């Protein structure tokens, strides 16, 4: 977009947020190079303290606000020399306590031209003003220094080409040291300022004249690519050769230059030798992931080694029989084995899919443990902790066990995903049970196990076939491979009525099979064939039919793999919002590309233990309060999460989004009465078995699948890529730390013919999705320089072959009715079949 400038006088500041310097102001226009025709314009952006009635020039892009019309989104600004009257008004404003109009006039009279610079240079002249006390004088100078310094720094940062948001993040991190630090060490931003990546830091460094082959540039790119690869792929390490390749691509594309790969390899060697990153043989680790994996091994080993008095098997068996009698159930052999092993082990792993009785076994473990130790489960001070990765999973645990449960973050006192700290003492418990452990990443697992005492018994529960954690690692899957850890896998399905087929479907898909009756209508599930272009028309009809049958709109959840596209989360959220909560007059708040309305269904995106709201929690907007009525002077959204009221001002709205449709990842740990699952070939590489399996197992009563049979077929046969982790080897002690920490040695070893990639990739079926899945062919025997001069071979794979009548083709889809011969009565019949 083109940048325009607007020069003029600030009429008034409409809104300001002191925490991030975001301001909205009204500018009376004197001059502009745009074709904007009005005499005043709204200007928004990050800026320091500005003065009403003073002249400024703002540069930025013209944007169209749905409510306020065309406005300028500022990227940088300059203040003209302030007038005497403007300074008097500024000094006498609420910014400065104890300064009235007469005192302000006297200050301007004493200091003359450019008074702000002169005041900061020589504040002693203020002593000439008799009615200005020493306290007010010092407060005035201190506040002026902050305001003026902030403006100067933010303005200077903007002049370097930094976005207002980036400038604000940098200033919040370094305050008055911001300019000195970034001018001397711009690449430090990559490591220390959240949200500032390599490209932003590199643009700044280029403006400061730092060469494209400067060592600090190469090091910053290596560190950035190392962590980026882990976050994107879920790996805890990356092979040296792959890291070098990724880094050189970034370095060369950022400045359109060619680099000598040997220079980058040298800097990687230096990083390893300086312990800025870690290596095991040819594997390169981000420091936090290396030590987190090592910590998991260390702490679990510590816990296992301490063997306090464990009840004998016959004593456990006797207590278990009493529990069976109390509950009126009989555990089968595998379930009994699981309960006995769990109570005899310091660390035990229980796995199983839906309907296999995990909750029944957990309740058996808890009640038998209580009987063995003489505990009254009705008391509040039990030495038992129940934990889960998400708030919804923790609440489900509480509902199923009737015991207190909380998120892992709450138990550890962590307030967000990025909050890393060590507890001063161990968790106060003798038994801890952690559910939904497949969602726990390497960092969180390390913090959890570090906080568990030697004498505590640990029971890990999860479904190994669900999606792995969003963060790096596959801790549950890796721990299941450790021979020394006792474990039981539940496979027999118990929770299924005669008419229930969802659990059976999930079990078949888990085994990589699309059952022969997949497209048949069942009492609890249905499938509708649809091209991606038809999904937006079909979903509202399905939801409407569900509501007409008596199902609450809150009980219907759309799950999708992707955010973009016609069948994506963003589009479906907009469609469903207009269907279920249409706009009434102007009662909505715009935020980025979203409109928030009263009664909207919303999803919380981060953990906040102070507010008792967590990542994945679903709530309702209860009220929208305009800024002119709030203490914060910002628009505020009032929300309820299961009765817990939360209020967010505008600067915190990035913590929430609409929840009519949500990602399958975000749905983990939750169950919904009705799940609508649109799956088409648009989702491409994301279509993997564990993704579909996770989505299907979220449905408690009804499951509606719609999309393309080819996409479902591909997904269930595609196991996806296995993550690169090193946790198993740490337990097996089958590795040696590289003594010679040199990349030259690493590359030489690889060049002898061994493969440089350890990631096990299973591309699923031999025929993959059309135009979606690509492979990169790298010859590991080439030397490093030649590797990067070779073109990447991208070959398009063939589509899944399915029976032609199962899917729409490019030739015929546009000629078919959007409902594809399906009547609304057909949909209604499914929901009315109770």
Predicted features and spans:
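Conserved helicase motor core of P-loop NTPases
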Residues: 465-604, 608-611, 811, 816, ...
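Pre-Walker A segment
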Residues: 279-353, 369
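Accessory, non-ATPase domains that flank or precede helicase/AAA+ motor cores in DNA-metabolism machines
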Residues: 1-309, 828-834
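C-terminal accessory regions
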Residues: 624-630, 636-834
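ASCE P-loop NTPase helicase motor core
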Residues: 336-339, 343-519, 710, 721
């Amino acid at each position: 977009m083109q940048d325009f400038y607007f020069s003029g006088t600030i009429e008034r500041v409409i809104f300001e947020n002191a925490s991030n310097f975001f301001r909205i102001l009204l500018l009376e226009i004197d001059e502009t190079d745009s074709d904007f025709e009005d005499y005043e314009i709204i200007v928004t952006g990050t800026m320091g303290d500005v003065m009403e009635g003073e002249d400024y020039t703002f540069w930025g892009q013209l944007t169209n606000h749905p409510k306020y019309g065309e406005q300028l989104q500022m990227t940088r600004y300059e203040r003209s020399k302030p007038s005497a009257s403007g300074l008097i008004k500024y000094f006498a404003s609420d910014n400065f306590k104890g300064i009235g109009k007469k005192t302000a006039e006297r200050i301007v009279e004493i200091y003359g031209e450019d008074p702000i610079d002169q005041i900061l240079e020589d504040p002693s002249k203020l002593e000439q003003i008799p009615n200005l006390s020493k306290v007010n004088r010092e407060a005035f100078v201190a506040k002026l220094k902050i305001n003026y310094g902030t403006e100067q720094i933010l303005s200077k940062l903007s002049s370097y080409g930094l976005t207002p948001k980036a400038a604000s993040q940098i200033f919040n991190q370094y305050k008055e040291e911001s300019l000195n630090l970034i001018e001397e060490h711009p690449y430090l931003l990559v490591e220390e300022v959240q949200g500032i990546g390599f490209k932003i830091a590199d643009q700044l460094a280029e403006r400061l004249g730092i060469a494209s082959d400067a060592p600090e540039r190469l090091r910053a790119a290596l560190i950035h690519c190392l962590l980026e690869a882990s976050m994107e792929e879920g790996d805890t390490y990356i092979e040296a050769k792959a890291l070098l390749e990724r880094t050189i691509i970034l370095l060369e594309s950022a400045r359109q230059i060619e680099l000598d790969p040997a220079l980058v390899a040298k800097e990687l060697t230096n990083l390893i030798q300086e312990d800025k990153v870690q290596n095991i043989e040819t594997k390169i680790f981000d420091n936090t992931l290396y030590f987190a994996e090592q910590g998991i091994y260390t702490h679990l080993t510590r816990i296992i080694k301490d063997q306090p008095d464990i009840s004998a098997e016959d004593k456990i068996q006797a207590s278990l029989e009493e529990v069976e009698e109390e509950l009126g159930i009989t555990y089968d052999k595998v379930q009994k084995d699981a309960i006995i092993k769990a109570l005899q082990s310091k660390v035990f792993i229980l796995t199983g899919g839906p309907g296999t009785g995990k909750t029944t076994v957990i309740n058996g473990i808890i009640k038998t443990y209580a009987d063995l130790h003489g505990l009254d489960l009705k008391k509040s001070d039990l030495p038992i902790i129940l934990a889960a990765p998400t708030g919804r999973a923790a609440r489900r645990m509480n509902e199923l066990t009737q015991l207190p449960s909380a998120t892992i973050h709450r138990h550890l006192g962590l307030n967000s995903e990025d909050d890393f700290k060590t507890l001063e003492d161990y968790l106060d418990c003798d038994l801890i049970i952690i559910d939904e452990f497949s969602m726990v990443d390497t960092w969180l697992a390390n913090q959890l196990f570090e906080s568990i005492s030697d004498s505590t018994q640990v029971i890990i529960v999860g479904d190994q076939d669900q999606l792995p954690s969003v963060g790096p690692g596959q801790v549950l899957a890796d721990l299941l491979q450790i021979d020394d850890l006792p474990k039981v896998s539940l496979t027999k399905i118990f929770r299924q009525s005669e008419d229930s087929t969802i659990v059976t479907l999930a079990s078949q898909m888990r085994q990589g099979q699309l059952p022969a009756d997949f497209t048949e209508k069942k009492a609890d599930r249905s499938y509708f064939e649809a091209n991606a272009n038809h999904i937006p028309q079909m979903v509202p009809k399905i939801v409407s039919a569900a509501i007409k049958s008596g199902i609450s709109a809150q009980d219907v959840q759309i799950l999708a793999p992707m955010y973009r596209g016609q069948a994506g989360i963003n589009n479906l959220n907009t469609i469903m919002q207009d269907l279920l909560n249409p706009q009434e007059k102007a009662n909505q708040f715009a935020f980025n590309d979203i409109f928030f309305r009263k009664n909207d269904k919303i999803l919380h995106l981060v953990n906040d233990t102070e507010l008792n709201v967590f990542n994945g929690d679903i709530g309702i907007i209860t009220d929208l309060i305009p800024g002119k009525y709030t203490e914060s002077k910002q628009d505020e959204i009032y929300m309820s999460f299961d009765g817990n009221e939360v209020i967010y001002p505008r600067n915190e709205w990035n913590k929430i989004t609409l929840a009519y449709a949500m990602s399958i990842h975000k749905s983990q740990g939750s169950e919904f009465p009705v799940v609508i699952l649109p799956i088409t070939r648009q989702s491409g590489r994301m279509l993997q078995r564990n993704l579909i399996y996770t989505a299907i197992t979220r449905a408690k009563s009804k499951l509606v699948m719609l999309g393309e049979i080819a996409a479902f077929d591909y997904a269930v046969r595609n196991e996806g890529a296995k993550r690169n982790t090193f946790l198993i080897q740490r337990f097996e002690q089958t590795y040696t730390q590289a003594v010679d920490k040199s990349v030259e040695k690493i590359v030489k070893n690889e060049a002898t013919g061994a493969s440089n990639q350890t990631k096990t990739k299973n591309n699923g079926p031999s025929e993959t999705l059309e135009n979606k899945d690509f492979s990169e062919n790298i010859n590991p025997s080439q030397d490093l320089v030649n590797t990067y001069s070779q073109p990447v071979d991208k070959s398009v794979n063939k589509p899944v072959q399915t029976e032609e009548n199962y899917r729409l083709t490019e030739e015929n889809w546009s000629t078919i009715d959007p409902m594809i011969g399906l009547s609304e009565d057909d949909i209604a019949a499914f929901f009315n079949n109770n």
